């Protein structure tokens, strides 16, 4: 989604929200949370408050009128009723074949509400220096996580990674094989963005940065001589990230056409650009997700940009056997989250079994 459109949709949602949601928004913007994250949270609050109105928990007629006391007095049974509403809501739609909203979706909704309740009960201060209220009902609401061993998760993810020579083969496929299948009209569109698309995918595969970190890169953040980029990690922390050498020619090729192809001016600081009606804009995360899905599905299997992050992490662990190094590359404070990659790279375990 283009930044201008994203901000427009955020403003539209904010216009309907209660005052305490607007305070929450400003507080998280200062952290800073990304506009994309805040937009997703606002959508979750909109869904929750619409349910509050429909359920009769409040006498308010509009979302903006829902008093803070409604959240303060929300019971565990009320919140469980909301979860059931989410789970059963698709059944009301005659056009759906699903039995209910996925648990992942429900967990995402509850995560947004947990963030709001933590802010209201712990982080915000009134004139007396106290939170607005103390009772956090979200601490009593259980969430169900998908039960899966690390080994099982690793095996599932492994099928969607481009390991070994497949990393370079994927880039070469986009460059030379993919365009052979296109119509003249589609080929024209592909050629316009070919260098940019290859540069984005090469960077994701060569650095393991998150999608949000990649799209928010500015020109000043790129050092091709040292092959290092500066990114803003979760929580607003700045970090220097090394980039594998194989990405350099793709990044250089994109830079060579960036100004002329996308009509970029000195004021256009974004590294990765898109052009809409002759005006350059920072490319948005949604466009990159669609682009990665399109190319990867045609090559082997449809994947997300996050799977490209997993690809880099797995290849790096395979080469170094160092969880500390992988954690540092990914921007994680702990090596616990990198345990997954030790299970993906399990040749030693398989070799041991073969000897039995």
UniProtKB/Swiss-Prot annotation:
Q: How is its activity regulated?
A: FtsK is required for recombination.
Membrane-spanning residues where?
A: none
Locate the Core-binding (CB) domain: which residues? 16-121
Q: Residue limits of the Tyr recombinase domain?
A: 169-354
Active site located where? 210, 234, 306, 309, 332, 341 (o-(3'-phospho-dna)-tyrosine intermediate)
The Gene Ontology CC terms held by the record are: cytoplasm
Q: Where in the cell is it found?
A: Cytoplasm
* Pfam families, per the entry: Phage_int_SAM_1, Phage_integrase
Classification via PROSITE patterns: CB, TYR_RECOMBINASE
Q: Which UniProt keywords apply?
A: Cell cycle, Cell division, Chromosome partition, Cytoplasm, DNA integration, DNA recombination, DNA-binding
Q: Which GO terms describe its molecular function?
A: DNA binding; tyrosine-based site-specific recombinase activity
**What processes does the entry annotate via GO biological process terms?**
cell division; chromosome segregation; DNA recombination
Return the InterPro entries for the record. CB (IPR044068), DNA_brk_join_enz (IPR011010), Integrase-like_cat_sf (IPR013762), Integrase_catalytic (IPR002104), Integrase_recombinase_N (IPR010998), Integrase_SAM-like_N (IPR004107), Recomb_XerS (IPR023670), Tyrosine_recombinase_XerCD (IPR050090)
Q: What does this protein do?
A: Site-specific tyrosine recombinase, which acts by catalyzing the cutting and rejoining of the recombining DNA molecules. Essential to convert dimers of the bacterial chromosome into monomers to permit their segregation at cell division.
**Member of which family?**
Belongs to the 'phage' integrase family. XerS subfamily.
Give the protein name, as stated in the record: Tyrosine recombinase XerS
What species was this sequence derived from? Streptococcus sanguinis (strain SK36)
